[in-house]
């Protein structure tokens, strides 16, 4: 899913885990820079609204999800002299539902504000978010090293491989 936005994309993406229930409650879990590399979980509400088509809206504040749309300065970028006051990361909390097959094998979303595509895929029932994210982080550390400033470097034995344009926003 390409994007035609000329804005400069940054970062390599953030993994969020979500558990939606039929009562319009959603549990969101994450462990990344926006949670200061600690596991964070919050529960809020969701709804599907109509706005030139179906839109998934996170209609109440969620500490995990709304960290991406909060227009505050990011404290962990201050050392680099960056100031995001007024824009933050520029993330969304309302998403156009681009594709949602009847078999629920995935859902493709597009942020209403930024236009970034997001893919939702189901996890197995009963997966504990905190444990799952710990396993992902353990694998990432094994493959990409610990305390590496640029996560676009793959370590294989003594060899290091750098990925060019790994975060250009185009899948």
Language-model features, listed with the residues they occupy:
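Lipid interaction determinants
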Residues: 1-41, 51-171
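Conserved hydrophobic positions within beta-strands
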Residues: 46-48
């Amino acid at each position: 899913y390409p994007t035609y936005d000329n804005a400069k994309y940054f970062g390599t993406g953030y993994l969020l885990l979500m558990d939606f229930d039929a009562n319009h409650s959603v549990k969101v879990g994450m462990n990344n820079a926006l949670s200061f590399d600690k596991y964070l979980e919050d529960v809020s509400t969701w709804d599907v609204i109509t706005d030139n088509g179906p839109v998934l809206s996170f209609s109440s504040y969620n500490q995990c999800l709304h960290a991406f749309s909060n227009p505050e300065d990011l404290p962990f970028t201050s050392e680099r002299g960056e100031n995001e006051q007024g824009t933050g990361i520029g993330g969304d909390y309302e998403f156009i539902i681009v594709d949602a097959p009847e078999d629920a094998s995935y859902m493709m979303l597009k942020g209403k504000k930024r236009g970034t595509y997001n893919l939702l895929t189901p996890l197995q029932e009963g997966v504990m978010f905190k444990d799952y994210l710990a396993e992902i982080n353990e694998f990432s550390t094994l493959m990409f090293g610990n305390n590496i400033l640029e996560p676009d470097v793959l370590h294989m034995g003594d060899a290091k491989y750098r990925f060019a344009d790994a975060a250009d926003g185009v899948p």
